[in-house]
Amino acid sequence: MLVVAACGTGDPPEPITPPLPEIDLAGFQQLLAQLDQPAIVNVWASWCLPCRAEAPLFQAAHTQHSQDIAFLGIDYDDSQRGARLFLDEFDLPFPHYYDPDGTTIAEYGGIGVPRTYFFTSTDQLIYTHNGAIDQATLALHIDELLNR
């Protein structure tokens, strides 16, 4: 009887609001075209341990460089609930989008998550980083974007 009570479903969880806006390839390309500055796009998922490890690096980089570089996040292969909890936990202040079927990131290549894309102010992809990024690599590519 105790086991049954402990395994009960109870009340359904509260919905996570607001949900991340969904984005597809056309919407992503339009978003990039509207930016007048270089962009760093981090692809992540809430269940991804390396994504969780690198999140503070992106928070710090955004704080330091948000006047000169646009930061965007794309949640991939995840739930809206997991995504919102991840963003709340890491307090990532830049825009994030939900790519439910992966079409946006498939266009730009790379493997798995995390993945980070570096775009010039003219929307040219200059570097794709697969896997967790470290501080030195992130700083190197930020410098490349700023000095183009």
Model features per residue range: what roles?
Residues V3-A6:
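C-terminal motif of bacterial Sec signal peptides marking the signal peptidase cleavage site
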Residues G8-I16:
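Bacterial lipoprotein signal-peptidase II cleavage site
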Residues P19-P38:
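A short beta-strand-turn-helix
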Residues D36-A39, W44-W47, G112:
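Short pre-active-site segment immediately N-terminal to redox-active cysteine/selenocysteine motifs
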Residues I40-V41, F71, T116:
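Hydrophobic beta-strand anchors of alpha/beta hydrolase catalytic cores
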Residues S46-A53, R115:
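C-type cytochrome heme c attachment motif
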Residues R52-F90, P100-A106:
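Structural microenvironment flanking redox-active thiols in thiol-disulfide oxidoreductases
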Residues F86-P93, P100-L146:
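Thiol/disulfide oxidoreductase modules built on the thioredoxin-like
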